[in-house]
Amino acid sequence: MSKSENLYSAARELIPGGVNSPVRAFTGVGGTPLFIEKADGAYLYDVDGKAYIDYVGSWGPMVLGHNHPAIRNAVIEAAERGLSFGAPTEMEVKMAQLVTELVPTMDMVRMVNSGTEATMSAIRLARGFTGRDKIIKFEGCYHGHADCLLVKAGSGALTLGQPNSPGVPADFAKYTLTCTYNDLASVRAAFEQYPQEIACIIVEPVAGNMNCVPPLPEFLPGLRALCDEFGALLIIDEVMTGFRVALAGAQDYYGVVPDLTCLGKIIGGGMPVGAFGGRRDVMDALAPTGPVYQAGTLSGNPIAMAAGFACLNEVAQPGVHETLDELTTRLAEGLLEAAEEAGIPLVVNHVGGMFGIFFTDAESVTCYQDVMACDVERFKRFFHMMLDEGVYLAPSAFEAGFMSVAHSMEDINNTIDAARRVFAKL
């Protein structure tokens, strides 16, 4: 047995499923998950000594690549001063200044410890600010594991949501309406059914948890218009897209102004950080200045703030996003060319430093139904064959891939060459 197999066997006796987040268990592709010993730049190194070009990037945070010296040094320096104080620090102020400068729609920001904390807190704030209870989310979008968000659509377009996880009471789910991504008609129908009851829409501006599905041109502006028409808040969940699709996020890339923004992943530089913020009048409703409660023992802790501050300063440097886009575009085009040579139908969506690979005969993939129609079994075989070639993709047909500026054009070309060999056998 390999070291990964031995560790996985031991882990399953001690940790549910052997992992601390379900997708890591390789249940979406089968087989034994890799146990990682170290990472550097664009590469992961497993406990068996094998190296992989990494397109998971810790599920998004590693936009600069692994073990970036600026972030590593910032963490070391901060740790020498203490790990956590439970009191305000100068770095929290500097971090808030930087975030609000980089994302102009955020007048104020509150730091938390994860993307889930950011989205659940933003929704609570929206409910408290509007005095309404219902929310709209979209089928196939993921906003963390808060109870109100683990909800799937009911049997009809206007039915109330149903829990999609045991442990979520139906009474919680009934306040969540699930609409179709990229379908404004379904959103208008929900508003017309409940015109005075919907507090907010929460949306991934690029859906990254049904692989990678960008918005149609009219979708995000249409959501903004519907929120204005019916008096609801628009929450853009940029946990995945923030600082990756563009410096000011997908909201800037697509030209839409939210009321609240949720951030995570890149904002922590690899440390556990989330944030939410937006309009000053809305944020003023948050405790201690307002009645909507939110708190956290480790929120804004000095180690995480130092890592995030260092990361964002690097991400804000000229040329970073142009490089991400160039590398991702080359990868997408190369994969399509290689698939076409082998006669394999493929769609590759990409925007900024995100991409998604879909085995499908369809000309495009724009919604959850399109994603579910793709050939998942073929993706599973593709994943393992690419892994054998030394390329680490997300171990699920429903997760996006992530580029970093640490990837070289040689890494990209080697990945395309590997895919060409795999497609010939697939």
From Swiss-Prot:
The keyword Isomerase applies. GO terms for biological process: protoporphyrinogen IX biosynthetic process. GO terms for molecular function: glutamate-1-semialdehyde 2,1-aminomutase activity; protein homodimerization activity; pyridoxal phosphate binding; transaminase activity. It catalyses: (S)-4-amino-5-oxopentanoate = 5-aminolevulinate. It holds the Pfam family Aminotran_3. Its EC number is 5.4.3.8. One of its GO terms (cellular component) is cytosol. Pathway: Porphyrin-containing compound metabolism; protoporphyrin-IX biosynthesis; 5-aminolevulinate from L-glutamyl-tRNA(Glu): step 2/2. PROSITE patterns: AA_TRANSFER_CLASS_3. Induction: Induced by low extracellular levels of magnesium via the PhoQ/PhoP two-component regulatory system. The modification N6-(pyridoxal phosphate)lysine is found at residue 265. Keywords: Cytoplasm, Isomerase, Porphyrin biosynthesis, Pyridoxal phosphate. Its cofactor is pyridoxal 5'-phosphate. It is found in: Cytoplasm. The keyword Hydrolase does not apply. It is an enzyme of class 5 (isomerase). PANTHER family: GLUTAMATE-1-SEMIALDEHYDE 2,1-AMINOMUTASE, GLUTAMATE-1-SEMIALDEHYDE 2,1-AMINOMUTASE 1, CHLOROPLASTIC-RELATED. NCBIfam families: hemL (TIGR00713), PRK00062.1 (NF000818). Homodimer. Belongs to the class-III pyridoxal-phosphate-dependent aminotransferase family. HemL subfamily. Aminomutase that catalyzes the transfer of the amine group on carbon 2 of glutamate 1-semialdehyde to the adjacent carbon 1 to form 5-aminolevulinate. This is Glutamate-1-semialdehyde 2,1-aminomutase. It comes from Escherichia coli (strain K12).
